[in-house]
Amino acid sequence: MDEQQWTGQLDLTVFFDGNRSVSRDIFFEKALKVIRPVYLNQSTIPTFYIVNVGGGYLDGDRYRMNVNVEDNAKVTLTSQGATKIYKTPSNHVEQYQTFNLKDNAYLEYVADPIIAYENAKFYQHNTFNLNNSSSLFYTDILTPGYSKTGEAFKYQYMHLINEIYIEDELVTYDNLLLNPNKQSINEIGYMEHYSHYGSAYFIHEDVNQKLIDSVYETISSYSNTFDCRVAISQLPTHGFAVRIFAYRTQIIEKILGTIQSYIAENIYDRKLDFLRKY
């Protein structure tokens, strides 16, 4: 796509300088920007806050983001607030995100919810390029926004594609389409009467069935405490995926945060940094 047609774009490279991970080659323009990194609690891992300066995604908006994590570097990415998709009467919103992870690199991307309002149309395509030794933790939360009638699922559609490659081989292709006009979203086989959806991927060379079982034991009790459903499955590589149905964003955030904390403590031997957004 011609650069003139992007509503916002962002390029970021993170490398390891021998002591900590640092950024270079930062470029952003128009409606996307990234705040100068912070090292929370004296961590050696930078945290970047990605901001949409326009306050929301509008009819026909196009966004592009490219993140490179070099050898031995680690980075945490998050958003400063929810991604709000407003009504798109003429043309849908598109977002393309590419993440390139080199040897022993680790990317942790925990964004705020994507909120689709009445008559919104949203398409997101993520591509993750990993090496055998690189690692990834990525989450998404989908939330129905306000409608005049008070009904959920008044958006036109939400279409999210995630492609994960390891050593240039496609190992996961996740194609999620929620289209209330053509699907009975509330029914069994879709959202099963729940209104909010959360997902996570974790890829690391130490992932095996024993670790997956341990993660599930850590989060399974939430189904007894809250009205939600949680499932975990092994990917066709050294990784797993988590799916969550709930009625509230906060429940999904709590479950995803528990998984993220488990990974930080059991895989990386560190405490999870509080992102301090508010």
UniProtKB/Swiss-Prot annotation:
Signal peptide: none
InterPro entries: UreD (IPR002669)
Keyword presence, Cytoplasm: yes
Pfam families in alphabetical order: UreD (PF01774)
Keywords linked to the UniProt accession: Chaperone, Cytoplasm, Nickel insertion
GO cellular component terms, A-Z: cytoplasm
Transmembrane stretches, start-end: none
Broad class of the protein's primary localization: cytoplasm
Localization of this protein: Cytoplasm
Entry GO MF terms: nickel cation binding
Description of how the protein assembles with itself and partners: UreD, UreF and UreG form a complex that acts as a GTP-hydrolysis-dependent molecular chaperone, activating the urease apoprotein by helping to assemble the nickel containing metallocenter of UreC. The UreE protein probably delivers the nickel.
Biological role stated in the UniProt entry: Required for maturation of urease via the functional incorporation of the urease nickel metallocenter.
Family (UniProt): Belongs to the UreD family.
Protein name (record): Urease accessory protein UreD
Organism for this UniProt entry: Staphylococcus aureus (strain NCTC 8325 / PS 47)
Gene giving rise to this polypeptide: ureD
